[in-house]
């Protein structure tokens, strides 16, 4: 049986705990596979913009499955081959609910990630490395009003990264 395709996750698989460094052995393995004619795919929960650094470092990735499968991108021309975007009406409804609570969340849409200053400031308080946070901010687009994002893009997914304990029960209703 010949291997035709290799797909790898990013966080915790391709990169280490710092979310940034790709071990040399992984770079060599992916490039060796490419030399043998094997298709290389990154499959990640990240947006394409937040995965661009890893794709560039490897230099041998053919396709990216992004936002937990919401879109598949052909990296030859950056075109979306297939997608499963969230319903616009439902997305607006979700944002209206989110805005009632002090939630830390990201919007992934049109191959990019979007965050508020509030989300970024709260991420800085987490245990993520400062170097990653600096990189993260350059790859995410800041918004003032999430409705501007969801009304003008194709939303792939939301990441709710922090929910205060006092809000959990109310959100389940």
What do these predicted ranges mean?
Residues 24-129:
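Active-site phosphate-binding/coordination module
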């Amino acid at each position: 049986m010949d291997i035709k395709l290799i797909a790898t996750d990013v966080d915790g698989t391709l990169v280490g705990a710092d979310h940034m460094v790709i071990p040399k052995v992984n770079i060599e393995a992916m490039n060796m596979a490419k030399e043998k004619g094997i298709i290389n795919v990154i499959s990640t929960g990240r947006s394409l913009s937040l995965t661009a650094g890893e794709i560039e470092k490897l230099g041998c990735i053919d396709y990216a499955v992004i936002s937990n499968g919401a879109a598949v991108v052909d990296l030859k021309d950056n075109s979306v081959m297939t997608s499963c975007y969230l319903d616009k009406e439902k997305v607006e409804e979700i944002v209206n609910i989110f805005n009632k609570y002090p939630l830390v969340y990201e919007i992934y849409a049109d191959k990019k990630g979007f965050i508020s200053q509030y989300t970024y400031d709260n991420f800085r308080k987490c245990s993520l490395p400062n170097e990653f946070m600096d990189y993260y901010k350059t790859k995410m687009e800041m918004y003032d009003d999430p409705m501007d994002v969801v009304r003008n893009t194709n939303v792939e997914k939301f990441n709710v990264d922090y929910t205060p304990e006092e809000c959990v029960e109310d959100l389940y209703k």
